[in-house]
From Swiss-Prot:
The keyword Hydrolase applies. Keywords: Hydrolase, Nucleotide metabolism, Nucleotide-binding. DCTP binds at residues 111-116, 135-137, 156, 170, 180. The active site is at 137 (proton donor/acceptor). It comes from Azoarcus sp. (strain BH72). Homotrimer. The gene is dcd. SUPFAM superfamilies: dUTPase-like (SSF51283). This is dCTP deaminase.
Amino acid sequence: MSIKSDKWIRRMAEQQGMIAPFAPELVRSNEGGKIVSYGTSSYGYDVRCANEFKIFTNINSTIVDPKDFDARNFVDFVGDVCIIPPNSFALARTVEFFRIPRNVLTVCLGKSTYARCGIIVNVTPLEPEWEGHVTLEFSNTTPLPAKIYANEGVAQMLFFESDEECETSYKDRGGKYFGQTGVTLPKI
């Protein structure tokens, strides 16, 4: 299994629709101002988060249970800047829609700009033949409110191509998050 380069990422995005919308180069400014970069890097693709957020709150004093998750634990927010409360988290989704090839596994890592501020991005791997918008989780590990900027870079996707195709892909087994288009809450 090997990590894939910028040339491969461009080819797969442009010819196979692996990433849409797609930025073939790293974008570092927008309308004259500096932004957290997004787009194609040497061995990865920096994704943006959309302006749709679900901010965790405990106003209902419920227990967080992944088998029986209460959607009331979140407050929906739409905007260019999301403020995450101290020691809390928010969910968002990528601007980009992904179509992962059958012989590729994609791993997501946080960007250092956010990590150096105590904001951690968590995403599970994008499995072979998974497709959809990626649900992102941002943890604010600080005792202060923290900002996340919509339509700017938030995480980097690394693509690993296997020497052979998997026997059963995410699509083959009917994965529960296949084709998700918005911020998706836990499912069992």
